[in-house]
A protein has these predicted regions:
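Catalytic-domain carbohydrate-binding cleft regions of carbohydrate-active enzymes
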Residues: 1-225
Length: 225
């Protein structure tokens, strides 16, 4: 189809165009700014030192990314109580300096009995499966890990809702990482997978999907804010 749009000016044409395709999400202003990302920042003092260095040297800084060390044992949607005992207050402290903290969220959920997200995922069959129907296990940063099935709408909503934990503490953006999904090793890593039923999707064939779905999960939660 070809659309011809007439308008009084460029603004009017853009307005009509957006009416055709739907309104797009407008990122927050800070997202267009400068960010600092480095593995190894573990405590509040690490982040304070980075922020101070930028300010004292008159270098723009709008975001500091938080790698996996802010978590409790590298578990998604957790914060180390030892290193960040008052996390929401620290987030506000950085916000007062016009610096947003952007925490990483990895694609895998640690296999750990008693870990709420793991227990919920197993109970509701939200994780990717092997051909025999058992939950797929691979090793990533936290050790043995399950991966939320982003082709399952219920699993997507469930995983997306977990972002609220951080949003409610003042977080306004996320670093969704390891969306390939990345794995270090698994029992199937060196085995050929052939003759799977059509209803089963090999990971290489589905690789573009998890990242897209996880981005959608997090953005929808931020918009809800």
């Amino acid at each position: 189809d070809i659309y011809v749009i007439e308008g009084k000016n460029a603004y009017d044409i853009v307005k009509q165009f957006r009416h055709v395709i739907g309104r797009s999400y407008i990122p927050p202003k800070f997202a267009f700014g400068f960010g600092q990302s480095r593995w190894g920042y573990t405590t509040k003092e690490d982040f304070r030192t980075v922020a101070k260095g930028y300010r004292e040297n008159h270098i723009p800084i709008d975001m500091i990314y938080m790698d996996i060390d802010y978590m409790q044992s590298f578990k998604d949607f957790t914060v180390s109580e030892e290193n960040f005992p008052d996390f929401s207050e620290f987030v506000q402290e950085m916000n007062d300096q016009s610096i947003r903290l952007i925490p990483i969220i990895d694609a895998g959920v640690k296999v750990e009995p008693g870990y709420e997200i793991y227990e919920e995922g197993v109970k509701n069959n939200y994780f990717c499966k092997r051909e025999d129907g058992s939950d797929f296990v691979a090793a990533v940063w936290p050790g043995d890990t399950h991966f939320p099935d982003m082709l399952n709408p219920e699993a997507r909503k469930w995983f997306g809702d977990k972002y609220r934990f951080l949003i409610e503490q003042g977080i306004e953006g996320f670093w969704n990482d390891m969306n390939e999904p990345a794995i270090f090793y698994s029992s199937e890593a060196l085995q050929r997978q052939e003759n799977l039923p059509e209803s089963l999707q090999r990971i290489p064939e589905a690789r573009p999907i998890p990242g897209k779905c996880r981005t959608r999960c997090s953005v929808l939660q931020i918009i809800r804010k």
